[in-house]
């Protein structure tokens, strides 16, 4: 090839690369890209969750109900209900969420107080309310959604009138602490941590000085340590986390079996439905420990896909929070992002032995309607926020106008 030909070839290659990069940049900067990334990653995680719940719950479902599909059918029902709620939430205006903030808070506190009186105990925790038949409600899951909406609304109002951080902390911190105490009284330590994570995410987005988070962290550490010492089973979990060999056949059994399942899967997995651990060796295989079943059946490829989807979802949500000029959107997105990301980190970290087991499910993937439906509603709210961004509104109006003209 001549020098001129090589130069032309190199030039064309550079133009092609530049075109690809510019095309990717245009897609990334599209006003609706955040909307589609949130929606796409959510639907993929939800779909994967339904498939894995069908596989992971089949043995337990046969043992309890005599059918391999009962738990999966219930999860599908939860997913349909949650998807309908997501659609309504995505079609709602930002003003609807702001006006409903105090209603959500009142309902959350009503349910948290009710569970102390009429709650039923499940797996050692009295944090469920019987609805009808086999269906139960976990108020602490709804409380997370309420705290996001109410906290974002309160701080949005204060952002306009009271700029000092001392006034920003009231009433959101006292109300959140009361909510955490009620959840803790029900024995739900995991969701107590999640409420704290949501509070920190909203306050960080509101611009609270970093030094205050150091104070909150110190207070939180001593509070968690005191609660751990007060409950022997929590101390056992911490001890086993620090020394996995201390009680491998007791408190450490679940984590050790989860890690064994992940190791068994290798790169490609043993195949969908082929898990051996779900046959009784791995407790809560379809709920808190569904991630090891994904690793066993779909291998490193499957677990990497889950991590990638959570990464895309997190990037999209925090991108919405960072770019939005609406204070409510910025704060609500930070709260939901902290909720989903930290819950996923705690769940997966516990499976890998990096964190103590706290009993929180993997968002959008684990079995359970009480966790799934509020999560989908919160994502629907963010989709509504993404649709209402100025650039997105212009594109939607143009599409609606073009569609109306085609119908004429």
What is each PLM-predicted segment?
Residues 1-20, 24-25, 347-408:
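A juxtamembrane structural motif centered on a specific transmembrane helix
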Residues 27-42:
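N-terminal membrane topogenic signal
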Residues 39-55, 61-254, 292-350, 377-381, ...:
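Hydrophobic alpha-helical transmembrane segments of multi-pass inner membrane proteins, especially
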Residues 57-58, 262, 266, 352:
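Short, small-residue-rich loop/turn micro-motifs
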Residues 127-134, 252, 280, 355-363, ...:
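Active-site-proximal inter-transmembrane loops
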Residues 133-143, 185-187, 266-271, 360-372:
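Glycine/serine-rich anion-binding loops at beta->alpha junctions
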Residues 188-193, 270-275, 285-287, 304, ...:
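Transmembrane helix boundary and interhelical junction motifs in multipass membrane proteins
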Residues 240, 244-291, 298-302:
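TM-adjacent membrane-interface loops and short helices in multi-pass inner/ER membrane proteins
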């Amino acid at each position: 090839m001549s020098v001129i030909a090589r130069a032309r070839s190199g030039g064309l290659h550079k133009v092609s690369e530049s075109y690809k990069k510019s095309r990717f940049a245009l897609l990334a900067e599209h006003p609706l890209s955040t909307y589609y990334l949130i929606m796409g990653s959510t639907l993929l995680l939800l779909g994967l969750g339904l498939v894995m719940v069908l596989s992971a719950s089949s043995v337990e479902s046969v043992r309890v109900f005599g059918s391999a599909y009962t738990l999966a059918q219930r999860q599908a029902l939860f997913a349909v209900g949650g998807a309908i709620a997501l659609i309504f939430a995505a079609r709602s205006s930002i003003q609807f969420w702001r006006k409903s903030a105090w209603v959500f808070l009142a309902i959350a506190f009503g349910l948290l107080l009710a569970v102390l009186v009429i709650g039923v105990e499940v797996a050692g925790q009295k944090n469920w309310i019987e609805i009808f038949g086999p269906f139960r409600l976990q108020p602490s899951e709804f409380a997370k959604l309420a705290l996001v909406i109410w906290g974002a609304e309160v701080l949005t109002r204060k952002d306009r009138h009271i700029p000092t951080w001392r006034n920003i902390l009231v009433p959101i911190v006292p109300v959140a602490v009361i909510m955490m105490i009620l959840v803790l009284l029900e024995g739900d330590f995991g969701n107590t941590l999640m409420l704290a994570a949501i509070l920190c995410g909203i306050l960080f987005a509101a611009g609270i000085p970093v030094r205050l988070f150091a104070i909150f962290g110190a207070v939180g550490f001593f509070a968690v340590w005191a609660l751990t010492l007060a409950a022997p089973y929590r101390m056992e979990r911490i001890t086993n986390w620090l020394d996995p060999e201390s009680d491998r056949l007791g408190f450490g059994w679940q984590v050790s079996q989860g890690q064994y399942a992940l190791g068994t899967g290798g790169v490609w997995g043993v195949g969908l439905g082929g898990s051996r651990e779900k046959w009784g060796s791995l407790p809560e295989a379809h709920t808190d420990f569904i991630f090891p079943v994904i690793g066993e059946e779909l291998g490193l490829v499957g677990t990497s896909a889950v991590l990638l989807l959570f990464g895309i979802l997190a990037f999209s949500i925090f991108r919405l929070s960072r770019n939005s000029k609406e204070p409510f959107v910025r704060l609500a997105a930070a709260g939901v992002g902290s909720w989903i990301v930290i819950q996923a980190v705690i769940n997966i970290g516990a499976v890998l032995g990096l964190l103590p087991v706290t009993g929180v499910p993997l968002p959008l993937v684990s079995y359970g309607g009480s966790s799934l439906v509020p999560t989908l509603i919160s994502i629907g709210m963010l989709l509504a926020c993404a649709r209402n961004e100025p650039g997105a509104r212009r594109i939607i109006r143009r599409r609606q106008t073009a569609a109306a003209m085609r119908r004429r």
